[in-house]
């Protein structure tokens, strides 16, 4: 094993040799250290070695987290080479599908998810002395989670554990303050990089063409290899086609995460003497990875970002603008070995619209996998962890709801036995539940195939079919024929999952509905029921989706949707399988509701999933209180029109309202329509349920005497006062009881009566204990108004004689006395 000074001497050209001793001293004195160094300074390769040299083997190993598998592999290989060893000796790495670690390994380079698994299995991290978080500026959700769990371990269980945060562009002030950690800076020896901006901004659709054009231009004007950054694999493939054979003999290499390790090694390997190459890369090449000979960077200015929609519960990839710190990382790749140039495919003026730093993924991501890991770690309160960026409470609530639905956590957010099994699988809880719940050997194998297909890029991207079973069949055919081709990575992942759940490979033909059953287990909220026209479905979550009309799946009544694109109006289904209704995990409920169409209460026993009803049967002997509540709610919703809303009811409301306004001190009950409706559940049940029978139809409800029901809301003594102050009728000289019209309380009550019935009436009637004079609306024999007055004495003495002339002319057969006060009042016709 090399000593500290030997390591420094062998790496004298690396700028971080100047700070290596300071880092070790800071680690001795502090629990956390923050370090910044520019790209190429040796922070990812030299410093872990010098830290190792400063600790005894008995102190424990060093874990270094890299955000990507490609970087983890290359960094480990480079450190091993610096020690004149092979990986698996003093330096090893663990990434998905690869493990180069032995008992003698002291530095283990791992990806973030692996550290989380280690902490869940051993919260003490026994045998580990230092945890290094490299390229921490990327702030992936896995990195933030791994840090929070490690920090909790350090604070509560392992105060001797050391944590190092490393980056080239991180916001050091906030992190140093949060961790109470010293900052060590390495200025590095970067060569100058000339930045050239485009004259116009490009759109995502123009990226492959614009990058190819810039590469052609740069290739002819500058020496050295070219590294171009594009958002995704499809952009790289299109750009590669545009460059095909045009720059020969310069070789063109793609570089992205889904390539095999051998393909990735070819892309980053140094060019031969006198040779040039072009590397078309996703952001995987932004950090840690060293591509020797690069002197030109072409930056599209875009990346692919997973965007989570909490309303739909779905995530989708979007092509978005990069942040300025990402642009700095990318341009730095051109100045590692010599002066370089960076072509930025955006205008200088547009940079003010770019974010200063990338937004932490935890602020926008689906938190369900994170919360399941936290529960498996033994923490039920996710917000209590020492986060650098605390997750949004709404996103936490959404994730907890999903985990509860999947049965992974209980109501106290504690992990269940099912959740414990799910947490052991390195995939989303949706997928892990599907594999854990698979029981038979055939189901287990099928679940592993489905998981692998969903986890990887769809090999049939040019195929419009959304049939998941088509993919499964093609995968199994490729395995049978030992001709995997484009299915090789999916087959590799499926095999890994089979090993994890102890399943055996199966290449038999499948039943489509069996696949649908497994998908529905994984995504219960994506069970889809056909609606409206062919190809349109509604998910159990309430989201509407559609599938191409030409698809063989479009005519099914039920589907289990495995992949889709979220949309506000109508999402698009990318992968699905048919589903039998009897295979759906449903909840049984008794639903009692008011059926407006049929005018009555409907009572059903239903099997449901989310907002969807799978099937229903009539419900007999329903709970009476529930039926009564349903009727009350219907009345509140549809109005008192469901009841016998007569003129008598309206007049009663007016009478009571008038007295209430005249005498607020009485505190009369409120009989306004709004209040009566809002309190229907308090007074209406007595009339709905009578003699053991509940009224359930609109016709039956019409039989309720609403006038008496509302009148009964007023205590008896108050009823008497209302009758005294605002009588419903007034008896006139003819003996008739005439109804009083109580209009607005500010207006006088009106008594509409035929003039002939008032002969002999000396004084105008009053209400409100004699305080308010009634407005007399005197009518002709034909019930037409002839006079309005509140002074009958004055009327008889004056206006009556003019009215009499007109009435004698119009009604000559009727009796119109000259002295009405002495005349007999009559109800009918009295001849002259």
Segment roles from a protein language model:
Residues 1-434, 502-510, 546, 550, ...:
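P-loop NTPase motor module signature
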Residues 120-121, 204, 309, 354-357, ...:
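Short conserved micro-motifs at the rims of enzyme active sites and ligand-binding pockets
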Residues 190, 544, 736-738:
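Short, solvent-exposed loop/turn motifs
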Residues 443-544, 557-729, 767, 771-832:
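Acidic, serine/threonine- and proline-rich low-complexity intrinsically disordered segments
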Residues 730, 734-740:
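Short, surface-exposed polybasic-aromatic patches that bind anionic ligands, especially phosphate groups
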Residues 749-754, 760:
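Phosphate-centric recognition/catalysis
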């Amino acid at each position: 094993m090399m000593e500290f000074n030997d390591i420094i001497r062998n790496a004298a050209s690396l700028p971080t040799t100047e700070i290596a001793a300071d880092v070790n001293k800071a680690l001795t004195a502090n629990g956390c250290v923050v370090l910044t160094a520019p790209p190429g300074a040796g922070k990812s390769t030299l410093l872990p070695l010098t830290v190792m040299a400063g600790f005894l083997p008995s102190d424990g190993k060093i874990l270094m987290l890299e955000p990507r598998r490609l970087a983890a592999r290359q960094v480990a290989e480079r450190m091993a080479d610096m020690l004149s060893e092979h990986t698996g000796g003093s330096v090893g790495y663990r990434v998905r599908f690869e493990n180069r670690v032995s008992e003698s390994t002291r530095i283990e380079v791992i990806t973030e998810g692996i550290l989380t698994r280690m902490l869940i299995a051993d919260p003490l991290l026994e045998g580990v002395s230092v945890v290094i978080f490299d390229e921490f500026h990327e702030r992936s959700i896995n990195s933030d989670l791994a840090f929070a769990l490690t920090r909790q371990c350090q604070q509560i269980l392992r105060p001797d554990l050391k944590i190092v945060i490393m980056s080239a562009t991180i916001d050091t002030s906030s992190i140093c303050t949060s961790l109470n950690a010293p900052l060590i800076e390495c200025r590095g020896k970067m060569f100058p990089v000339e930045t050239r901006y485009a004259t116009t901004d490009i759109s995502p659709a123009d990226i492959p063409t614009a990058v190819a054009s810039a590469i052609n231009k740069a290739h002819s004007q500058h020496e050295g290899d070219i590294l171009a950054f594009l958002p995704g694999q499809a952009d790289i493939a299109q750009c590669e086609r545009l460059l095909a054979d045009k720059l020969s003999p310069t070789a063109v290499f793609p570089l992205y995460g889904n390539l095999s390790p051998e393909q990735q090694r070819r892309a980053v390997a140094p060019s031969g003497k006198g040779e040039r190459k072009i590397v078309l890369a996703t952001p995987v090449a932004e950090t840690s990875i060293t591509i020797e000979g690069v002197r030109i960077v072409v930056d599209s200015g875009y990346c692919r970002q997973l965007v989570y929609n909490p309303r739909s519960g779905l995530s989708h990839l979007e092509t978005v603008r990069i942040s300025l710190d990402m642009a700095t990382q990318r341009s730095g790749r051109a100045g590692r070995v010599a002066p370089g140039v960076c072509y930025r495919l955006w205008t200088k003026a547009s940079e003010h619209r770019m974010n200063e730093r990338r937004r932490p993924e935890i602020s926008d991501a689906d938190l369900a996998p994170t919360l399941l890991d936290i529960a498996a770690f033994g923490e039920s309160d996710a917000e209590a962890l020492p986060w650098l960026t605390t997750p949004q409470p709404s996103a936490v609530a959404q994730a907890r709801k999903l985990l509860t639905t999947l049965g992974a956590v209980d109501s106290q957010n504690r992990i269940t036995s099912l959740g414990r099994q799910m947490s052991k699988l390195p995939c989303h809880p949706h997928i892990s539940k599907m594999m854990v719940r698979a029981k038979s050997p055939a189901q287990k194998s099928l679940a592993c195939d489905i998981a692998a297909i969903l986890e990887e890029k769809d090999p049939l991207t040019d195929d419009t079919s959304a049939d998941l079973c088509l993919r499964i069949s093609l995968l199994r055919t490729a395995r049978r024929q030992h001709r995997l081709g484009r299915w090789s990575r999916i087959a590799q992942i499926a095999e890994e999952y089979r090993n994890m759940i102890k399943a055996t490979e199966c290449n038999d033909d499948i039943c489509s509905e069996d696949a649908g059953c497994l998908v529905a287990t994984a995504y219960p909220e994506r069970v889809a029921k056909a609606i409206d026209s062919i190809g349109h479905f509604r998910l159990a979550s309430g989201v509407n989706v559609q599938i191409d009309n030409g698809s063989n799946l479009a005519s099914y009544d039920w589907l289990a949707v495995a992949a889709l694109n979220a949309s506000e109006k109508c999402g698009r289904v990318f992968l699905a399988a048919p589903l039998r209704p009897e295979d759906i995990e449903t909840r049984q409920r008794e639903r009692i509701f008011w059926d407006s169409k049929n005018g009555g209460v409907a009572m059903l026993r239903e099997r449901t999933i989310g907002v969807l009803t799978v099937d229903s049967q009539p419900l007999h002997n329903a709970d009476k209180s529930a039926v009564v509540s349903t009727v009350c709610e219907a009345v509140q919703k549809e109005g008192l029109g469901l009841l016998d809303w007569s003129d008598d009811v309206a007049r009663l409301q007016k009478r009571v309202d008038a007295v209430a306004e005249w005498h607020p001190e009485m505190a009369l009950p409120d009989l306004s329509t709004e209040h009566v409706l809002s309190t229907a559940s308090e007074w209406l049940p007595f009339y709905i349920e009578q003699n053991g029978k509940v009224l359930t139809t609109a016709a039956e409800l019409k039989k309720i005497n609403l006038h008496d029901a509302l009148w009964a809301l007023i205590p008896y003594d108050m009823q008497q006062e209302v009758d005294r102050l605002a009588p419903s009728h007034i008896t006139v000289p003819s003996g008739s009881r005439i109804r009083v019209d109580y209009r607005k309380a500010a207006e006088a009550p009106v008594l509409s009566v035929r003039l002939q019935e008032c002969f002999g009436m000396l004084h105008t009637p009053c209400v409100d204990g004699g305080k308010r004079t009634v407005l007399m609306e005197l009518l002709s024999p034909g019930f037409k108004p002839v006079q309005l007055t509140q002074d009958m004495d004055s009327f008889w003495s004056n206006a009556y004689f003019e009215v009499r002339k007109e009435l004698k002319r119009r009604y000559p057969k009727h009796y119109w006395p000259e002295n009405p006060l002495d005349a007999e009042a009559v109800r009918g016709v009295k001849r002259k």
